[in-house]
């Protein structure tokens, strides 16, 4: 409340200046001496300040001194009790009540505790005596005197620490998931972020220093770029002229915070706007936990920025273990969950588990330097093996012949354990992948892949091409041994029927887990959208000549050699007995509705139009909406000879889904005119009725992309629309 009083006084102090600038009548005094009216002027200003102070809050304040309050803190309240019922109970048992606030969580549910204020100290003491241990809906209330708000503050801190909020350093995730772009934004005060996390922030912003010709329509037009504006007002003086002050109310609190970030300090008609939260939108009461600065060692004056996101320090020990993204979220919520979760998917505690741990390394801060080192070592080993291929291949044929009996033994206890492992592991796939989706939301460091991949150019891929050429020659000498291997695999697979039968049953249980993958994969799509920086183009261009040489090597490995591998022995009788029919119908059909829309949304946002390939390696060119994929890279992937299409032309048309069915093309055009000049708008119709989707064409790709950023997720008549670039335009 003290903050509200100061804000009201500040606004009142600026009002005379506004009136003078707008040409409001001012009382002059001759020869610089204060006249009789001039002597009354300070008294009038003081009265105006007092009036504004009384009017400052949206609740009745019974105390002249706002720091002196007679409050009681009540806990163990049944969760279904509303604040009005609690107020009636206290009024009946104690007497007059001036203020009741039931503490709520982010979803609007009661936390089981409340703050009750009284006008007199005797009422506060009586409440602690009478209501303590009073049974309400079978639960004994716990009532304590709390004049300084200390009990309420501790309760809030305890609740927020349980949910991962305060006490975890700046940026810790609170009761509402706040994007890092807001947490680390210097334009937004910390108290506003804390109130937003607690779900106790209003949706109204206060705008000052407006040009006097700005009306409410212009104000609404400007601030609509930050969100859905419910109401916009310009404050006027007694003559009906603008005072250069406005108030804008949004549909959601986060839109108001976004407006502060977007417009505070920006010029409107050559005047910088001052945008802040309206004092009535800030949370009431002083029991909200204040921000506590990080405790520093004695004698240390301060610290600079760490190397992690948002200036957070990183843990070097975690980096060496491959979990460097542990500090990605400002509260230490990181990517180690991915490596750990994937490692548990199939109960893979054996050799597979060791391999899957590398997923944690890849996710950890996109540690591309480590990948470079691994690839370099692998390529060197491949080159050495290929150089020995002339004599070594001949020696390896008897070894491959001896693989047949070994493969027979694979299908016994090993395959049965695999079935059991899959059964336990697949049940956890859904929850683990959900955690992957949440973490991918925070993968702001994916944008650094471009610069990291650029370092992969001179990795020694030339050695890889020459090695593959030698592998082609070696494969020609392996044929007879592989034939016998095929025979052994045929017998082995016949014994795999029973374990695979059990795999079919476990995959049926995957349905519910995969259904939870939808939102996660959609969030992964948003992150993947940032994975095509310009740095990737320059590095991949260097791979063009190398890929040409790899094509000739791959040709030598195909056709004749693979035909001699005896794989036909694996078909018919053995595969028919594998129980794969259990994997259809009930299980895989449930995977379709969950993965279909989600994968569609995620892959479309990746901006990749992947084709096949032609000539020696692939048939069609890779089309990428973003990135500089020209030159030799396009030539190698575009087939032998000629230049591939390379960069796809950016589209100027967007596709809008989930529109209200009463929305017309004119309404659609008017709505998207806020983003830029619309050339064409249309609603898709079927049998004369709207299909709930439409297209909008702009004059440039940049305007189309801006429309996607501004309008995607906006609510129209209660429906959240989906806006994306129309690839088919």
UniProtKB/Swiss-Prot annotation:
Modified positions (Phosphothreonine) in chain numbering: 664
Q: Which residues carry this modification: Omega-N-methylarginine?
A: 495
| Modified residues annotated as N6-acetyllysine in this record | 133, 276, 671, 697
Could you tell me where the Basic and acidic residues compositional bias lies? 37-49
Where are the residues linked by the Glycyl lysine isopeptide (Lys-Gly) (interchain with G-Cter in SUMO2) cross-link?
Answer: 17, 37, 68, 82, 87, 126, 133, 142, 144, 220, 276, 284, 344, 380, 387, 650, 666, 684, 691, 697, 715
Q: What does this protein do?
A: Pre-mRNA binding protein in vivo, binds avidly to poly(G) and poly(U) RNA homopolymers in vitro. Involved in splicing. Acts as a receptor for carcinoembryonic antigen in Kupffer cells, may initiate a series of signaling events leading to tyrosine phosphorylation of proteins and induction of IL-1 alpha, IL-6, IL-10 and tumor necrosis factor alpha cytokines.
Q: What is the lineage of its organism?
A: Eukaryota, Metazoa, Chordata, Craniata, Vertebrata
Locate residues linked as Glycyl lysine isopeptide (Lys-Gly) (interchain with G-Cter in SUMO1).
697
Compartments, as annotated in UniProt: Nucleus
Q: Which GO terms describe its cellular component?
A: catalytic step 2 spliceosome; collagen-containing extracellular matrix; nuclear matrix; paraspeckles; synapse
On modification after translation, the UniProt record reads: Sumoylated.
The RRM domain covers: 70-148, 203-280, 652-728
InterPro entries assigned to the protein according to its UniProt record, in alphabetical order: HnRNP_M_PY-NLS (IPR024666), hnRNPM_RRM3 (IPR034990), Nucleotide-bd_a/b_plait_sf (IPR012677), RBD_domain_sf (IPR035979), RRM_dom (IPR000504), RRT5_SRSF_SR (IPR050374)
Q: How does it assemble?
A: Identified in the spliceosome C complex. Interacts with PPIA/CYPA.
Q: Sorted alphabetically, which Pfam families does this protein's record hold?
A: HnRNP_M_NLS, RRM_1
Share an example GO biological-process annotation for this protein. alternative mRNA splicing, via spliceosome
**Disordered: annotated span:** 1-65
What protein name is recorded for this chain?
Heterogeneous nuclear ribonucleoprotein M
Q: Identify the domain of life.
A: Eukaryota
Kindly list any coiled-coil regions of this protein. Answer: none
Q: Where is this region: 27 X 6 AA repeats of [GEVSTPAN]-[ILMV]-[DE]-[RH]-[MLVI]-[GAV]?
A: 399-607
Sorted alphabetically, the keyword list is: Acetylation, Isopeptide bond, Methylation, mRNA processing, mRNA splicing, Nucleus, Phosphoprotein, Repeat, Ribonucleoprotein, RNA-binding, Spliceosome, Ubl conjugation
Among Gene3D superfamilies, the record links this protein to: 3.30.70.330
């Amino acid at each position: 409340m003290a903050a509200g009083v100061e804000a009201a006084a500040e606004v009142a102090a600026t009002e005379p200046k506004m009136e003078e600038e707008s040409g409001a009548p001012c009382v002059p005094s001759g020869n610089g001496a204060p006249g009789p009216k001039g002597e009354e002027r300070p008294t009038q200003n003081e009265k105006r300040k007092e009036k504004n102070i009384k009017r400052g809050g949206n609740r009745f304040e019974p105390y002249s001194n706002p720091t002196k309050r007679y409050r009681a803190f009540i806990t163990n309240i049944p969760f279904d009790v509303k604040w009005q019922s609690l107020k009636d109970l206290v009024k009946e048992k104690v007497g007059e009540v001036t203020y009741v606030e039931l503490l709520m969580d982010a979803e609007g549910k009661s936390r089981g505790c409340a703050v009750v204020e009284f006008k007199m100290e005797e009422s506060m003491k009586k409440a602690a005596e009478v209501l303590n241990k009073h049974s309400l809906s079978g639960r004994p209330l716990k009532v304590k005197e709390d004049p300084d708000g200390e009990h309420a503050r501790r309760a809030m801190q305890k609740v927020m620490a349980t949910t991962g909020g305060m006490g975890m350093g700046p940026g810790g995730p609170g009761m509402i998931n706040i994007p890092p772009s807001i947490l680390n934004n210097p334009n937004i005060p910390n108290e506003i972020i804390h109130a937003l996390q607690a779900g106790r922030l209003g949706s109204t912003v206060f705008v000052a220093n407006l040009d006097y010709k700005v009306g409410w329509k212009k104000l609404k037009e400007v601030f609509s770029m930050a969100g859905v504006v419910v109401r916009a007002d310009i404050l006027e003086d007694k003559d009906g002229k603008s005072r250069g002050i406005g108030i804008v109310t949004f549909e959601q609190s986060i839109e108001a915070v976004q407006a502060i970030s977007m417009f505070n300090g920006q010029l409107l008609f050559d005047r910088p706007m001052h945008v802040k939260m309206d004092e009535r939108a800030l949370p009431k009461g002083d029991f909200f936990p204040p921000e506590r600065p990080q405790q520093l060692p004695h004698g240390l004056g301060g610290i600079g920025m760490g190397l992690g996101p948002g200036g957070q320090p990183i843990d070097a020990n975690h980096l060496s273990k491959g979990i460097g993204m542990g500090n990605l979220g400002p509260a230490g919520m990181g990517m180690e969950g991915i490596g750990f979760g994937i490692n548990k998917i199939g109960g893979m505690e054996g050799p597979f588990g060791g391999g899957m741990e590398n997923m944690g390394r890849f996710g950890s801060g996109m540690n591309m330097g480590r990948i470079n080192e691994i690839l370099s070592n692998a390529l060197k080993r491949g080159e050495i093996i290929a150089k020995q291929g002339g004599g070594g291949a001949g020696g390896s044929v008897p070894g491959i012949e001896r693989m047949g009996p070994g493969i027979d033994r694979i299908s016994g206890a090993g395959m049965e354990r695999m079935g059991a492992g899959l059964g336990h592991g697949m049940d956890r796939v859904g929850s683990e992948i959900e955690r992957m989706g949440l973490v991918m939301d925070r993968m702001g460091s994916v944008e650094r892949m471009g610069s990291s991949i650029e370092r992969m150019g001179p990795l020694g891929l030339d050695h890889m091409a020459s090695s593959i050429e030698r592998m082609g020659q070696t494969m020609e000498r392996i044929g007879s041994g592989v034939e016998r291997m095929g025979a052994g695999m045929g017998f082995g697979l016949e014994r795999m029927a029973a374990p695979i039968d059990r795999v079919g049953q476990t995959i049926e249980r995957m349905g519910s887990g995969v259904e939870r993958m939808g939102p996660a994969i959609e969030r992964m799509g948003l992150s993947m959208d940032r994975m095509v920086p310009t740095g990737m183009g320059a590095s991949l261009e260097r791979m063009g000549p190398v890929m040409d040489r790899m094509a000739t090597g791959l040709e030598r490995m195909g056709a004749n050699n693979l035909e001699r591998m005896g794989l036909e022995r694996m078909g018919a009788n053995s595969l028919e007995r594998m129980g794969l029919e259990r994997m259809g119908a009930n299980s895989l059909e449930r995977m379709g509705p969950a993965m279909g829309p989600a994968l569609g949304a995620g892959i479309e946002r990746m901006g990749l139009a992947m084709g096949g390939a032609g000539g020696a390696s692939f048939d069609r060119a890779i089309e990428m909406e973003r990135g500089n994929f020209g030159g030799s890279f396009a030539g190698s992937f575009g087939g032998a000879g000629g230049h591939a299409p390379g960069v796809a032309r950016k589209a100027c048309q967007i596709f809008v889904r989930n529109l209200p069915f009463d929305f017309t093309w004119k309404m659609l055009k008017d709505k998207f005119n806020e983003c830029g000049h619309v050339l064409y708008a249309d609603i898709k119709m079927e049998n004369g009725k709207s299909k709930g989707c439409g297209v909008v064409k702009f004059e440039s790709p940049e305007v189309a992309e801006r429309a996607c950023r501004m309008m995607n997720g906006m609510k129209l008549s209660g429906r959240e629309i989906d806006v994306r670039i129309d690839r088919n335009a």
